[in-house]
């Protein structure tokens, strides 16, 4: 059983690394990965211009338990919103430095990166901007 948990954790780390790289290629700056508080964890927190992006990463090896995106339920979305408030509270002094000066965030967006990593095909990435 420990081997299975270990394999799941390794798959999750792989997916989060792939997702972070994908977001960076889109021009985002990664601010935090696996940020934790008492209420839970945010996979990736990034900056996209003046927008704070909270990104949930779902990685699966197959679709036997459903597509990766299907696991982001309304309940999960509500929890991520609460965690985003906690992150913003903890990082109240965080500002976005730009060529025009220093500004706060003007919006928060919730994105999802779903990765299906089948051995025969390699990983495929589905990115949903503003998923909820």
Curated annotation (Swiss-Prot):
Q: Which domain of life is it from?
A: Bacteria
Molecular-function annotations in GO: nucleic acid binding
Transmembrane region positions?
none
List, alphabetically, the Pfam families matched.
Answer: UPF0102
Q: Which InterPro entries match?
A: Restrct_endonuc-II-like, tRNA_endonuc-like_dom_sf, UPF0102_YraN-like
- Family affiliation: Belongs to the UPF0102 family.
Protein name, entry field: UPF0102 protein Acel_1550
């Amino acid at each position: 059983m420990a081997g299975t948990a270990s394999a799941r954790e390794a798959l999750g780390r792989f997916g989060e690394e792939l997702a972070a790289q994908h977001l960076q290629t889109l021009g985002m700056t990664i601010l935090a990965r696996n940020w934790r508080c008492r209420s839970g964890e945010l996979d990736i927190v990034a900056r996209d211009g003046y927008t704070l992006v909270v990104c949930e990463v779902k990685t699966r090896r197959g679709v036997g338990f459903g597509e990766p995106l299907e696991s982001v339920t309304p309940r999960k979305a509500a929890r991520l919103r609460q965690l985003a408030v906690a992150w913003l509270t903890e990082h109240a002094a965080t500002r976005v430095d730009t060529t025009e000066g220093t500004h706060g965030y003007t919006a928060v967006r919730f994105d999802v990166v779903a990765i299906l990593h089948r051995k025969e095909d390699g990983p495929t990435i589905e990115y949903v901007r503003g998923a909820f």
